[in-house]
From Swiss-Prot:
Sequence motif DEAH box, residues: 391-394
Biased composition regions of type Basic residues, renumbered to the chain: 1-10
Biased composition (Basic and acidic residues): 103-112
PROSITE patterns given in the database record: HELICASE_ATP_BIND_1, HELICASE_CTER
Subcellular location(s) of the protein: Nucleus; Chromosome
Keyword terms, alphabetized: ATP-binding, Chromosome, DNA damage, DNA repair, DNA-binding, Helicase, Hydrolase, Isomerase, Nucleotide-binding, Nucleus
Family: Belongs to the helicase family. SKI2 subfamily.
Effect of deleting the gene: Impaired meiosis, leading to maternal mutants with eggshell defects. Mutant females produce ventralized egg shells, with phenotypes ranging from fused dorsal appendages to fully ventralized eggs with no dorsal appendages. Mutant flies are hypersensitive to chemical mutagens.
Keyword field contains Transferase: no
Name of protein: Helicase POLQ-like
PANTHER family: DNA POLYMERASE THETA, PUTATIVE (AFU_ORTHOLOGUE AFUA_1G05260)-RELATED (PTHR47961), HELICASE POLQ-LIKE (PTHR47961:SF12)
Keyword flag DNA damage: yes
Amino acid sequence: MANKHNLCKKRSLDLSEESTSESHAKRQCTENLFWPEGEDDDSFFSNAHLEDLLDGRKEELFGTQATTSTNKMTQSGSDDGLGLFADTSFPSAQSVPPNSASKPDEASAPTDKHQIDLADEENADKLFKKINLNDLSIAEMEDIFHGADDFSDPMVQNTQLFLDAMTFKKPKTPEKLLAPLKDDSMSFISKSVIEGLVQGTQYVTCEELKNQSLLDPVNWETQAFADFEKNNQDIDKFPSKGEFYGLPDKVKKMILEHKGINSLYEWQDECLNLPAIRQRKNLIYALPTSGGKTLVAEILMLRELLCRERNVLFILPYVSIVQEKVSAMSPFAIDLDFIVEEYTAGKGKCPPQPRRKRRSLFIASIEKGAVLMDSLIDVQRPHEIGLVVVDELHLIGEKGRGATLEAFLTKVMFLNANIQIVGMSATIGNLSEISSFLNADVYTRGFRPVELKEYIKCGPDLLEINSAGQTLEEIFVPSRSVEYNYSEAVKRADPDHLAGLISECAPEHCCLVFCPSRKNCENVALLLSRIVPKHKFFEHRRSEKLDLMDALDKMCGILSPVLAKTLPYGIAYHHSGLTTDERKYIETAYRFGVVTVICCTSTLAAGVNLPAKRVIIRAPYVGQEFLTLCKYKQMVGRAGRAGLGEAGESILIAQSKDNLLVGQMLFSPMDKALSSLDQNEAVGLQSLILSVVGLNLAECRRDLNRLVNSTLLSVQAKSLEVAVNEIVLRILREMFKNKVLQLAEPQAKSKINSSDIITSQDVSQANRPAGDRRLLIGQSTPFKLTNIGRAAFKAGIDYKRANAIHKELKQAQQQLILTNYLHLLYLVVCFNSNERGDELFPADASILFGVYTSLPLDSQAMFKQLGFTEAHAARLFKTQSVQGPLSLQLNRLYKVLILADILNLLPIPSVASKYNVERGTLQHLISQSTAAASAIVRLCEELEEFWCYKPLFERILHKMDRCGTFELEPLMELPAVKINRARQLYAAGFQTIGDIARVRPSHLVQSLEHMPLRVATEIVSAAKIILMKKLDHLEEETENLKDCLKTSDKN
């Protein structure tokens, strides 16, 4: 028990005089309730006051903390002492007989006709007998089950079936772990896996890692920092500005004020005092989800900005998280006098404005961060960046953007510009390889702020995963059998007892249900809303749920039909089919405790920090792919809430057909982050070579080989069985063949060693005998990019896409239609189009025909120019299919018509309904098209022949990025302010950025409907940041003019 208690250690480094319980309570209130600034301040979605929000939650927030034990799950009761179930504990193997539980006081039971009297345990057993799905209409039943994924169990699942399947793998303790450990928090998975999973505390330098292939497990008591004071001469000296890790004392107060954190965890203090930090070495620190990694990164970034006075680049995986972090860091920027800049899609100037007085924190997506760094290298200013922080570093192994991240980091390392790299990662199986790639020290710790208890549900049986088990029987410990005495109809609808498992937890506590697909999220949410105890869920914070529904309807333009049915019960779904605004409202309501159950896809585990009392994994699948151990750990890591000592519980529902795969997943090594530079015809490596030649980081084969040998691909070449140098030679041949590269000087003047040459047919020469001429390139033969090659590099795309868009632009230039935006939008869509043009979604033939026939003649001209005649229209109507010779063009035109409606300011919900596209997918199309327009602008800047396109696409970019009227465009510069919020601000009299910057957040809350105080604070802070940037620009211009005058006086 003592060691178990270590998992829940309280923060050890006090930053204030407050007591622990008070600070935890205040932190909870600060995060969830947005403390108002005055008595008249309103909060959350309605005009409800803070007292209303606190009603019924005082015991939860300020009462005694929830306690946990080894064998029992705890749950807070309602105000009258009654929970939904009289006994919710998980008994151990020596389980307590069901009839031995004491009965609550019958007098306090609810009397509503929809709520069964739980005072009598016999009646409690019949809880779901009151719910009869047979009473529902046929239409309602179709709503639940239409299109649902089939998770029916071909065999009746039970514990024995599961354990029989587990015999494929007898757990064996590796020799390294045979020594007795004082820490019993070591997961059984790590014991049976051996490789790559680290628990306890460990700090390993990159030099030490070169001599070992994997990281050793370390227990809690290991003194990993005994040699901190060695090599003091290498410690990086920087001007200290206070006692808080060298930062001013006001930073400590701001962290408490804005984050509600009054002390650091022990590991955070250790990490901030590591030799890698003190000696300014690269560092990777890896901890489980919800361990508090981001706060360490923020302290390091503030220290770089304020103490070393160098800019910082913060790379985040998702645009929505970038925008949230921009908002969160804006108050710090105002008080500490630095600039925060967002780099996503069309936002962010490249290269950024140079500044003399203030430092900049660039917060960027992976793709835009790479473009930003390239622009700084191109103008010889990479030294302005002092620190690069990468969140979710393990995404370097993801296909697509993983190659972009790897190329970006390779260039930063190759520059040798004294830029420190700090990476945050989940626990992965090959940290030693990532460390070798980045030449970084590694800090790991198996830390969770609260205890996590993991369960597997096999039929009615719940098996607890015992962290200290040595055999299958010890690892999978029978805990209890769930039996809610469902009616027959409910049994058919909910064979996995989801409603019962959720009702044990919600609505007093929050619950996440991870589903394999987006459609399944909606189906499960509908199902739960039908069969959970109606009165208990319906009455819980009823008025605030109505306010939430009103906010979604007014601010997002639509209330989803599914959400309209589920939100009254505090149940919602969350996936990419919703717009960003819809997801934010649901997330905020969840943090408030208004929404208590979210049915979501796996992206919620990686992207948004929404802790839960209980996490249920509906099925071990992500889409069609089976769940990996890394994804599983991310999902279950959301269970438990720091600050109140509340333990977390996770339940994985396993069907008999998946038993073997579940076992293989649990006993498998942690996922490895593998390089994808060589994937998809090595397009990632092509782009890397293109950019390093364009940036003059490599001018010959020798330079290229040296750079490519510093990639993660090179580190993993042996295990991946990849011949990196051969791939580079093949890419060079293709680039010369496609006129992307050319010799830097005439071949006759080049000194070529015949033993070091590569050969390629010079295809540019027509009508010549085969093999007549060959291009000879030695190791030191200099080469450079052609015009089209440089255009591809500037646009941030591979040369094949550059050639394709060059062809489209050339053809359109001869007969460009400018009577509307359709032709320009077609070129934008071409930029992201695949071979069929059906990326994101295919065209709907019937809708396309209907829209085409209603278009005015000047708009139909675009169709005719692409060869679409009346005969094609008749065939489209007859076949109701876009298949055929014009399928590519028609799929593209379908997206063009959608974007045209968006530019004409039609509401997103209306456009989504008109074209039968999910709102979130539509928003993704807009974001993708904005990025494409930005890339086309950069491409055209490099090609003189396309001089006329640049202002046209700049206008398209501006309109798509704002999607608002002229008077609203200034307001939409604010992060996360969309068209509806901008209209609301404008109507309330806040018509300029200056109007917003001058107002107090509390006044915004009072003036606008559905404006939480935290959002108001972030909007005001963002407005001030925009004005600070404008002021900074004017000051720079003034200083430059002064310098010019001084120079002229001297002459």
